[in-house]
Amino acid sequence: MDTMYWKDNTLFLLDQTKLPIEVKYVKLKTYEEVAEAIVSMKVRGAPAIGAAAAYGMVLGVMGYRNDQNLEVYLKNVYETLKNTRPTAVNLFWALDRMWKKYLEVKNQTFEEIANALLNEANSIFYEDIELNKKIGAYGLEVVPENASILTHCNAGALATAGYGTALGVVRAAFEAGKLRKVFADETRPLLQGARLTAFELLEDGIDVTLICDNMAGYVMSLGLVDLVVVGADRVTANGDVANKIGTYSLAILAKEHGIPFYVAAPYSTIDLNLTSGQDIPIEERNPDEVRKIGDRLIAPPQVKVFNPAFDVTPAKYITGIITDRGIVRPPYKENIKKLFGGK
């Protein structure tokens, strides 16, 4: 199923807060609605957020009225979308790309500007699918025969324009006949592993076993995991990785058990402007996400909650970063620079 699609000047977005109980698409006609969908995690996953924000810019220009300067108006659209979530760098990458396109065509007619922005958003969307397939192809190199892969959160088709990053590697292994099974962490507090990854893999006929987050170490100790593959929301210049909370713990467990730990992400997730993971802003979300599952209270309503959405895994715990341009291995600072043509 599609994470999102564009039709009749409307962004149709799969509401991932309803999965797996209900498959429902919401119709978004304004950039404000796109911003709300990102904040509320109707759409989530770094590449998917970027693509949605790009279409949000298109909806922004389509909602323009002649009562103010177009550039001032569009800058406000840009800032509104940019301020939705602070950690996933693909959001800023996609918005910067859309803004650059606007600056290229700003002297053209309004209709030409709108068409140029729509074409750019479409390019971001369809390019992401191709990037993910390349990630899958490169990742296949590190997957042993008859592999059992553990993954965290959801870095699949639902988190991207299609195919997935970490699950792109899983899909490539499945298609090549190299995959035995997948262990999916449930991923508290919003259960993306249980609700989304398990759902997505079952839809594809892939053998998946769901485990609680705190079972991962024991599963590894039993020799049931050959490698760990996760996605990323931001990779810094030194190879540190911000990803869904709980990733850091998995990386330490994998290292303790001698299990390769790979991160799968497109080049757009790498932020060369940040020297290390200490520079990454970590989003802290509503405490009720921990106090409740759905609408049901599972903890005392007055209890204090710490709810960071992401953690940072230091590069020393990462075996390799699987990108659409190849697999980056240590030393990361040097080899990430090479990935972008630097020396």
Swiss-Prot record:
According to the UniProt entry, its GO molecular function terms are: S-methyl-5-thioribose-1-phosphate isomerase activity
Q: Where is this site: Transition state stabilizer?
A: 153
What pathway or pathways are given for this protein in its record?
Amino-acid biosynthesis; L-methionine biosynthesis via salvage pathway; L-methionine from S-methyl-5-thio-alpha-D-ribose 1-phosphate: step 1/6
Binding residues for substrate, per the UniProt record?
44-46, 85, 192, 243-244
State the reactions this protein catalyses. Answer: 5-(methylsulfanyl)-alpha-D-ribose 1-phosphate = 5-(methylsulfanyl)-D-ribulose 1-phosphate
Q: Source organism's superkingdom?
A: Bacteria
State what this protein does. Answer: Catalyzes the interconversion of methylthioribose-1-phosphate (MTR-1-P) into methylthioribulose-1-phosphate (MTRu-1-P).
Name of the protein in question: Methylthioribose-1-phosphate isomerase
Q: Tell me which species this is from.
A: Carboxydothermus hydrogenoformans (strain ATCC BAA-161 / DSM 6008 / Z-2901)
Q: What is the lineage of its organism?
A: Bacteria, Bacillati, Bacillota, Clostridia, Thermoanaerobacterales
Q: Which gene encodes it?
A: mtnA
